[in-house]
Amino acid sequence: MKDAKLIFLKQERHILSLLLCEGRLLEANAYPLPAAGPAEEAEGTSGNVSCLLGSIYVGKVNNVVKNINAAFLELTKGQRAFLSLDNRNEPRLLNRPYDGRLLAGDEVLVQVEKEAVKTKDPVVTTELSFSGRYAVLLPTGCPGRLIFSGKLDNSCRKILKGFLEREEIKNVLERSSLIIRTNASELTEGEPLVQDILRLDSLAGQILSVAGTRTCYSCLYRPASAYLTEIRDTYHDQYDAIVTDSPDLYEEARLFLEQQCPGELHKLKLYQDPSVTLMNLYGLSAKLREATETRVWLKSGGYLVIEPTEALTVIDVNSGKYSGKKAIRDTFRLINLEAAAEIARQLRLRNLSGIIIVDFINMEDSADKQELLQALSRELRQDPVKAVVVDMTPLGLVEITRKKIRRPLREQLNETD
């Protein structure tokens, strides 16, 4: 991206992570500052739910609900979690040999894969995963699988497969599965990918080897701070600078980059101008405020109304102040196409997920409708989080689904205010 910056700001209660491109905010997340040190958290004291993502716990099963094929368990005292039993992966029990059943009182190794959202508990899985910049290691599922990101084309996959034809990687695949991430497309030689996989394999081995000696509610693994993993997980071509005005965050980021992304270290900058804050330099307060408002204006004069609810998000497209001289059909077509691009941006920026229903301005021509769906799908493919156009209903409503990973931006900001 042109003139793109990943900005980290340390506030009183949270760390802001902002992806800015040509002055526009593309992504924003607010991460609460930890209330306790790592040692206290590791002992299983109740922590902030938003800090759990990716962490591995020895959870205790409270009850199994057969009619929904799921179990509810505790990660720490008072912190419940939801475990679907549809996953065919065999759970790793620490209190007894697994006999095909999961029972109340069982102590099971789980990893948090989705944060708590509103009234819903965090979602955990028994299929553990360890993420690096180029690969994800799955040490507890069916071994031997080599899976490539759907965004990697066939020619790229062929090159990457060649990089993996090494004895060390074959040994890893005998006990684990691997997912090769989209970031691997940047590689021109295989050593960074191989070293990334071997580092993950060593980490997984260390954690699994001590799991049997840990007590219930123990936290065996807590990944690097979420704002740091964004550096690793954001595609390298999406930013040309990593900027912070906090010496503490700068040092944390420097150490993280040296270990996991040495090629990105030159992008890290410490902003030190006392005359104007980094927040004011880019007008970030106003941009964050706009990212939580209900109405979003389009350049054409049209606007979106974005209304999240408990069950889904509804987006209404309106012609608003549009004063063009084009025919009605062309007017509606142009506003809808502009709205499609802005909707894709807003979903990513606000971190809206689940079911999204969009009420575009009515169009009669089937070719215009097809063009709109194709344009919306094309825009959504730019989102690092999987987002899919499902269909247009007979009433002209467009249904989108977006994978739930983190909570909406409004919730993140409200929690930390």
Predicted regions mapped to residue ranges:
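Extended, charged alpha/beta regions that create polyanion-binding interfaces
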Residues: M1-V49, L53-S55, T125, S129-A135, ...
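Short nucleic-acid-contacting surface segments enriched for D/E, G, S/T with interspersed K/R
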Residues: L94-L109
